[in-house]
Amino acid sequence: MIKTKKIPQRKCVGCNEMKDKKSLLRIVRSPEGEISLDLTGKKNGRGAYVCHDKACITKAVKEKRLERALEKSISDEVYNKLLEDFDHGQQ
């Protein structure tokens, strides 16, 4: 019998859909409390996953889903930096 390899699934905090882990962006809160975009998926800290869609990120920000997932209040400056990093990652 052939074993099939499991593909890790994660839920997008914006649209609440389960998707492959590699198809999502990871936003991480480091142990020091710094919030950043994790392009490698290997940074240390608590992570939340979002689709590669600006609408999902905007919805996660607007409804404070990202704050709940990361268990930390997030300032507008950090949100703007995340959106800026997202835009640079798309190019």
Q: Predicted regions span which residues?
A:
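Short, flexible, mixed-charge glycine/proline-rich loop motifs
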Residues: M1-P8, T40-N44
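N-terminal, polar/charged subdomain of small-to-medium soluble alpha/beta proteins
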Residues: I7-Q9, E17, E32-S36, Q90
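Residues immediately within or flanking Cys/His clusters that coordinate Zn2+
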Residues: Q9-C12, A48
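Cys/His-coordinated zinc-binding microdomains
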Residues: N16, H52-I57
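Short recognition patches in nucleic-acid-associated and regulatory proteins
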Residues: D20-D38
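Short functional micro-motifs and their immediate structural scaffolds
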Residues: D20-S23, C56, V61
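Short beta-strand-alpha-helix junction that forms the catalytic/metal-binding core
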Residues: L37-H52
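C-terminal structural segments of small proteins and small subunits
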Residues: T58, K62-Q91
